């Protein structure tokens, strides 16, 4: 395994989690659905904890949390852009549309976040023994939460759009009702939505 590339992944993970905190803070301001707002408030607290967990990885393996990398700068730019998109929607769109923009921005942020943790899972299988325990412990604390953030919010985005289009929506979405934690579970929940109308 290439150590420079592993470090790059870790720097991007930290930046993604830090940006995720700002994404959730802004998304909560956009939320008009009380259930969604509560969900995102929970995810904000979890994401703040994820920042701490990744910081502990850095401390454990001797990385500087303040170091810059080209990839980290790009991740920060993407996160800032998602926040800016939500701020534009808040200032200029109807509340229901701003809420949809927020859900889409959360899905975009969580897609990168989910990938980071999935890659760390792959790294863990090949990691040196002194890193393996650190990575496994972090993965165990975060994995289910990351799955929930992505799959549940994707369900919210879909159902909010359906409602916005004037069609019957399932609120909360099936992904949340069925508490899905896998892509297969999310696909099954999506298929079952018509039965929940």
Model-derived segments and their meaning:
Residues 1-4, 8-15, 31-42:
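A short N-terminal beta->alpha junction/helix N-cap motif
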Residues 1-7, 61-64, 97-100, 156-167:
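Membrane-interacting alpha-helical segments
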Residues 4, 67-93, 97, 165-191, ...:
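Alpha-helical membrane-targeting segments
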Residues 6-29, 74-130, 137-140, 194-197:
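Acidic/histidine-rich alpha-helical segments that form the ligand environment
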Residues 16, 46-50, 141-145:
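A short structural micro-motif
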Residues 33, 63, 129-132:
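Alpha-helix boundary/capping and short turn/kink residues
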Residues 35-83, 153-156:
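Conserved alpha-helical segments that form or flank metal/cofactor-binding pockets of metalloenzymes
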Residues 102-193:
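Preference for long, well-ordered alpha-helical segments
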């Amino acid at each position: 395994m290439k150590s420079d590339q592993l470090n790059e992944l870790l720097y991007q993970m930290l930046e993604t989690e830090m940006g995720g905190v700002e994404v959730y803070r802004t998304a909560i301001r956009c939320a008009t659905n009380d259930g969604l707002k509560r969900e995102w408030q929970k995810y904000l607290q979890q994401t703040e904890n994820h920042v701490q967990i990744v910081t502990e990885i850095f401390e454990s393996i001797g990385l500087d949390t303040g170091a810059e990398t080209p990839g980290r700068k790009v991740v920060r730019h993407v996160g800032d852009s998602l926040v800016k998109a939500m701020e534009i929607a808040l200032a200029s769109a109807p509340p229901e549309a701003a809420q949809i923009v927020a859900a889409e921005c959360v899905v975009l942020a969580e897609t990168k976040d989910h990938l980071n943790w999935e890659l760390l899972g792959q790294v863990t299988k090949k990691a040196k023994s002194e890193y393996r325990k650190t990575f496994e412990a972090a993965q165990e604390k975060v994995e289910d939460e990351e799955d929930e953030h992505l799959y549940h919010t994707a369900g919210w985005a879909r159902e909010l759009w359906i409602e916005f289009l004037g069609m019957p929506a399932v609120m909360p979405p099936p992904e949340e009702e069925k508490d899905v934690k896998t892509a297969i579970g999310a696909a099954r929940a999506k298929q079952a939505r018509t039965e929940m109308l």
